[in-house]
Amino acid sequence: MYEDIQDLKEDYIFPTSEHASITRTMLALYAGASGDHNPIHIDIDFAKKAGLTDVIAHGMLIMSMASKSLTDIFSHEHIKEIDVKFVSITKIGDRPIFNVSVLRKKIYKNKRLLNLKISISDQNGDIKLDGTAKIELSDES
C-alpha cells in the first residue's frame, strides 16, 4: 500500500490489476449477495429477448472490482471519493483489468492529496468503467 506520495509524479501509472474472468457462477453469487436479481444478469432467455447475446455483468460488480483494486493500493480510510460512470457492458468471459494513474498531486497544510484517474477495461482494452478517485494522506498516516 502507498503511504508516501512524495515520489509519485503527475501522470504516474500504477501497475494494472487483473480480476478473474466473468462467469455465470460469479454473476449468480453476486446476485445472491447483493439482492440484485435483475434477469438481464442471470437469465439468458431474458437477455436474448432484450437483444443481447447473453447475460451481462452487474455494473456494481464491476465497481466493486475497481474499489477492491483501489484499496489494494491505498488503505480505505485514505479514499475520500470515487466518482465513476459505466461506459459499456461487461459480458461473460470478459476479464476486468483495473487501471489507475495520477492526474494531480497537491500538498496542502498537513494533507497530501491525489486525484486519480481510474478505469476498468477488458482484455481487449475496451473501457467498461471510467472515473476518478480522491486520496488524502495526512502527515500522521
Predicted regions and their residues:
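Hydrophobic beta-strand-centered segment that forms part of the acyl-chain substrate-binding groove
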Residues: 48-57, 61-103
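Hydrophobic alpha-helical segments with strong N-terminal bias
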Residues: 7-8, 43, 67, 72, ...
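Catalytic strand-loop segment that frames the active site of acyl-thioester-processing enzymes
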Residues: 1-55
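HotDog/MaoC-like acyl-thioester-processing domains
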Residues: 1-16, 91-141
